[in-house]
A protein has these predicted regions:
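Short, surface-exposed patches at the edges or C-terminal ends of soluble domains, predominantly
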Residues: 2-498
Length: 498
């Protein structure tokens, strides 16, 4: 009898072990199958309790450091419609949710108001509001108007379907602006035929904390409040004191930089189509930057246009993908940049022999040039419809030169399309973060570099920490095993004493 009982116990124990192993195998296979299908078809579960995107700790950290301590008069977030209308609209409810989270975090500072602009047109005009979907951020007499579109990012070529939510950054930037009325000014030069495809670069500089203004450097001196001077897509040269003009813009620029000024110069392969800009090119050579030209068979000076069919998002190879240098200060500055870096219709920057290589940088006296963005090694230069040059190292697309004796900075970008709406506001590109990081490296403080947009296709669990997610996974595996084990013990005990 003892032998028979022992065999039964062994048999039942074996069944229990087999069931336990079987359940473990099923759980593992189910987990692997669901994971594979989720990755293949983009399945995800939004774990946010409100089914919306919560404000991140990074954003709260920015507000704690740069906004809340200065908001003595309080911050008002004004939605320009009735509350029920805002909540009923799915898109606007995203924005309202973010505002409510901020108001809950800072109840003594941030207040939410609802204003029907159709019933109160006078108040709407005072703020400059033109649509009921606008949102006003105000502090005392200072205010900023955000359009509904400002809170979202859109993919290239699609202005209707947003790809990411940009709410916390838009609110943080607007709040920073209204509590900092003495913000530095970024002046855009306008007397060299400059033209902008859109306002994306200005919006990016506003995000960085600048006010925007324009400057005719031929008629006026560079103002004392100029925190940044920008020349974007010029069609003509800067003037120098010669027989043609008694006013030298070059001298004004030099005097500005001698006092620690910051200068950004954006050009493209089309900039020098009618020939070089002798004055500004000669001056920039002193800062380590020259632009490559080629003289054609008929003696016509032609500007290099960079092409790389292996690293391009267009078939012609002229819409380049840039890369961060692997050495030098540029690699350190841009170490945290992710996303695709796009530079189209770019010309070639060449560093003159007066600058000596030094661990990835180039040095001349008190000035150091750091490449920030380069092409891949396979890129080549074309001019006049023919290939004219190729280098094993690739070409520099963006450079930053700094003078340690004056703290002046000169950033040169060889692609105007690096700073247009499609790249600065399009989802998936890292151009905006790159630009903000460059401004920070130039000395601009309080730049919201760490504030990120939140993609709608994001499968990140925003609420759970990694440790919490791991504990839940362990529990989901262990609980079925524990249940089967307990059940098996109960069966064995009942049979033992039956």
């Amino acid at each position: 009898m003892a032998t028979t009982a022992s065999k039964k116990a062994l048999r039942h124990g074996g069944v229990t072990v087999a069931l336990t192993v079987l359940i473990l195998v099923v759980v593992i296979l189910l987990n692997a199958s669901v994971t594979t299908l989720a990755m293949r078809f983009g399945w995800y579960i939004n774990m946010n309790p409100t089914m919306l995107y919560p404000v991140t700790d990074t954003c709260y950290g920015y507000l704690d450091e740069f906004v809340i301590p200065r908001a003595d008069k309080g911050i008002r977030i004004i939605f320009c419609d009735e509350e029920e209308n805002i909540r009923a609209d799915v898109t606007q409810s995203y924005v309202l949710n973010t505002a409510e989270e901020m108001a809950a975090k800072y109840p003594d500072t941030v207040k939410i108001e609802f204003l029907n602009v159709w019933e109160h047109p006078k108040i709407a005009r005072e703020y400059g509001v033109t649509a009921s979907t606008s949102v006003v951020v105000a502090c005392g007499e200072e205010s900023r108007v955000c359009t509904l579109r400002d809170f979202f990012l859109f993919p290239v070529g699609d202005s209707e379907n947003p790809s990411a939510y940009n709410g916390e950054k838009r609110f943080a930037v607007a709040m920073k602006a209204v509590v900092s009325p003495d913000a530095p000014v970024a002046y855009f030069t306008l007397n060299h035929g400059e033209s902008t495809e859109d306002y994306a670069l200005m919006y990016a500089l506003t995000d960085a904390g600048y006010m925007i203004n324009y400057l005719d450097a031929l008629s006026f001196d560079i103002p004392e409040d100029c925190g940044l001077l920008v020349s974007y897509n010029p069609a003509r040269d800067f003037t120098s004191a010669d027989g043609v003009s008694g006013i030298s813009e070059i001298d004004k620029l030099d005097a500005y930089l001698a006092k620690g000024g910051k200068f950004m110069y954006f050009v493209s392969a089309d900039t020098f189509a009618a020939g070089g800009f002798e004055n500004i090119e000669t001056y920039l050579a002193g800062w380590g930057v020259t632009f490559a030209h080629d003289t054609g068979a008929e003696g016509v000076e032609e500007c290099f246009a960079l092409r790389d069919t292996a690293h391009s998002i267009t078939t012609d190879g002229y819409t380049l993908l840039g890369r961060i240098p692997s050495a030098g200060r540029g690699s350190e500055i841009m170490a945290d940049i992710d996303g695709v870096l796009r530079a189209a219709n770019a010309t070639a920057i060449r560093i003159p022999d007066t600058y000596a290589p030094s661990n990835g940088d180039y040095v001349s006296g008190t000035r150091t040039l750091s490449p920030l963005l380069r092409t891949y090694a396979g890129a080549e230069a074309w001019a006049g419809g023919r290939p004219v040059d190729r280098t094993a190292e690739g070409y520099d697309l963006v450079t930053l030169t700094q003078d340690r004796s004056t703290n002046a900075s000169v950033l040169v970008c060889s692609s105007t399309e690096f700073a247009i709406e499609a790249t600065l506001q399009g989802g998936g590109y890292g151009n905006a973060a790159f630009l903000l990081t460059a401004l920070e490296a130039m000395g601009k403080t309080e730049v919201p570099v760490e504030l990120k947009s939140q993609p709608f296709s994001d499968d990140t669990i925003h609420i759970l920490t990694t440790a919490q997610a791991r504990n839940i996974t362990i529990a989901l595996v262990a609980i079925p095993v524990l249940i089967v084990t307990v059940w098996g013990l109960i069966v064995l005990i009942r049979r033992r004493f039956a």
